[in-house]
Amino acid sequence: TGASSGIGRALAQKFSDEGWKVAISARRQNLLNEIAKEENIYAFPLDVTDENKVKEVFANILTVFKEVDLCVFCSGIYDPKLEQEINLNQIKKVIDINFFGVLNCIKSVEEYFKNKKNGHISIVSSVAAYRGLPNSSGYGPSKAALTNLTESLYFDFKKHNVRISLVSPGFIK
């Protein structure tokens, strides 16, 4: 998820370059279609906040790919201009996408990976999870919640031979 720009897009292109078949998803279909012109990349438009759509898209990916080995959940939003003041609606939107959206994605693949008894789920968080930053009243807490969630799920997934990992990059453009 989150493959229309930034880290998600770079990862999709890197995996494709290495010969992987890559399913990408994000809200911005025009950007997805541009990326999907590359070999081995298939676009699946998705709003991660829609739990039913997330399940539907994963089912569609399984139909096309037959098997999934790795899921990278990289969806997220951050706009420091919108977080200069505490705005509950903006904070709820950020947490809904950055935390609950990723949780929807994890939930949609959980049964598949546990039954397969193999696979890897990688969550992209942020250094903002570990330290408060200016203009980050929604973003930082959403990433901190992801970090804690991943650490908690590690124990449950490990029993099924499924790896779950967290990456916390610094600032990018």
Feature map (PLM): residue ranges:
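Conserved glycine-rich cofactor-binding loop
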Residues: 4-5
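Conserved glycine-rich Rossmann-like NAD(P)H-binding loop of the short-chain dehydrogenase/reductase
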Residues: 18-35
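Substrate-binding pocket helix/loop in short-chain dehydrogenase/reductase
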Residues: 82-83, 87-95
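Active-site loop immediately N-terminal to the catalytic Tyr-X3-Lys motif
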Residues: 84, 133-137
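Active-site helix of classical SDR
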Residues: 106, 142
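Alpha-helical segment proximal to the catalytic Tyr-Lys
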Residues: 111, 155-156
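Residue(s) in the substrate-gating loop at a strand-loop-helix junction
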Residues: 126
